[in-house]
Amino acid sequence: MLFDSVPSYITGMFGLMGIAAITKKRGGYTNTKMHGILAWSGIILASAGMYAIYQHKNNMGKPHFTTWHSWTGLSAFGGCIGLGLVGGVVLHPDFGLDTTNKQIRAIHKYSGRIVLMLAWMATLSGLKTLVGDDIKPILLFAVPLVVAAPFTLL
């Protein structure tokens, strides 16, 4: 039952991460703080999804992390947590250790784009596993990602 909610958690994470990316592009103190809040909200949703997946595998007696989909998803999840920690500890506008370091900011920015692309790949490969050769659901999910890509990745 909990496993059925995984797509909602992961889609919610995408929505929050996309909005967080767009919010940050506008710049400024308030947008930077909102970027962190939205991103960590997305991480919390993704955590619920990861928990549901892990418990589902345990309940079925299946091994964990045996597919490209699972490793890509785990990499994206770990990347989100790492970026969130760097953002919160190093780049936070109120108490960050090095808020003006342009190199750290650039690494954070481009790493975020890579992690978001990994998350998209994991989600699309998971959807492909669920729907098989039916291309319509994949297109319905992928087209909004393609439309949103210029706003979140560029």
What are these regions (language model features)?
Residues 1-154:
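Membrane-embedded alpha-helical bundles that constitute the cytochrome b-like, heme-associated redox core
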